[in-house]
Amino acid sequence: MSKPVRMEPGVKLRDGDKMALIPVKFMPDPNEEVLRKPDWMRIKLPPSSQKIEHIKSTLRKNKLHSVCEEASCPNLAECFNHGTATFMIMGAICTRRCPFCDVAHGRPLALDPDEPQKLALTIKEMGLKYVVITSVDRDDLRDGGAQHFADCIKQIREHSPQTRIEILTPDFRGRMEQALEVFRETPPDVFNHNLETAPRMYRVARPGADYKWSLELLRRIKEMHPHVPTKSGVMMGLGETNEEIVQVLKDLREHGVNMLTLGQYLQPSRHHLPVKRYVPPAEFDELKDVAMGLGFSHAACGPFVRSSYHADLQAKGEEVVGYKAK
């Protein structure tokens, strides 16, 4: 019998400790062979550079987090080398425990009231013209953290009025009305919320989330702010079918979503959901054609695409290549 996992405030639970708390258990098949990465998923990571170290030190100095590091994003070196990062607010401990995600679970600490200003000053110091702000889920907060998002938006606009702001939000489950009231007064330049996967996969991949709820959040934001582009991201390789993904794309368009990111799921550790298949670049290209045919203004589709991958280019409608030359 495994020992109980203690939930101390501010303590990060990862890997096996995190997965032990998931209500819907998935048991890896010991006889199932672990899929090897195909050639198109093999890239040579660049050595650490001054830009990478500068961004990391800037984040540490200002006590800020990036989802690039906390979620073990495979594009970290590329993005940091280009001087970009996706900031993660409200701490680095999530109240959810999705088995595809490498962000730590636990009991988060209270919000840092100085974080919005520290974030804004950091963005000004870095001279960023386009920023993506995301967060952990904060089910412990009355509004799910919506006001903290708004405070960050206000501070960034005060210190860097020319900087465009994209927010990648949680679902505000059970707190949608409070969140919408906040965003009514303080909308971002782009509103992003990820569906992540097909509805059939939700019980295993997104415990605590609801597919229709997420679609409704996107619809309500678009209804409230028709001129604010809405965006969503989906992973492939969890066991879904291409037909299910096409239906997800149709659902997104029916709920007014303008922009799409579609990428390959990668297993963060042996404790996480396994990769069921690696989707070839040609299939991503085909799904991009489907997405554009459905009326998305922009669709970034490819193995290495993530929600905020070259988000500035996506927002401009420029082409984003989602796979890399070896």
Curated annotation (Swiss-Prot):
Q: Please report the organism this UniProt entry assigns to the protein.
A: Aeromonas salmonicida (strain A449)
Q: InterPro entries attached here?
A: Aldolase_TIM, Elp3/MiaA/NifB-like_rSAM, LIAS_N, Lipoyl_synth, rSAM
What chemistry does it catalyse, as a reaction equation? Answer: [[Fe-S] cluster scaffold protein carrying a second [4Fe-4S](2+) cluster] + N(6)-octanoyl-L-lysyl-[protein] + 2 oxidized [2Fe-2S]-[ferredoxin] + 2 S-adenosyl-L-methionine + 4 H(+) = [[Fe-S] cluster scaffold protein] + N(6)-[(R)-dihydrolipoyl]-L-lysyl-[protein] + 4 Fe(3+) + 2 hydrogen sulfide + 2 5'-deoxyadenosine + 2 L-methionine + 2 reduced [2Fe-2S]-[ferredoxin]
Q: In which pathway does it act?
A: Protein modification; protein lipoylation via endogenous pathway; protein N(6)-(lipoyl)lysine from octanoyl-[acyl-carrier-protein]: step 2/2
Its needed co-factors are: [4Fe-4S] cluster
Please name the taxonomic classification of the source. Answer: Bacteria, Pseudomonadati, Pseudomonadota, Gammaproteobacteria, Aeromonadales
Q: What is the protein's name according to its record?
A: Lipoyl synthase
Residues that hold [4Fe-4S] cluster 1 according to the record: C68, C73, C79, S308
Subcellular location per the Swiss-Prot or TrEMBL entry? Cytoplasm
- EC number in record: 2.8.1.8
Task: Give the family per the record.
Answer: Belongs to the radical SAM superfamily. Lipoyl synthase family.
Q: Which UniProt keywords apply?
A: 4Fe-4S, Cytoplasm, Iron, Iron-sulfur, Metal-binding, S-adenosyl-L-methionine, Transferase
Q: Looking at the record's lineage, which domain of life comes first?
A: Bacteria
Cited SUPFAM superfamilies: Radical SAM enzymes
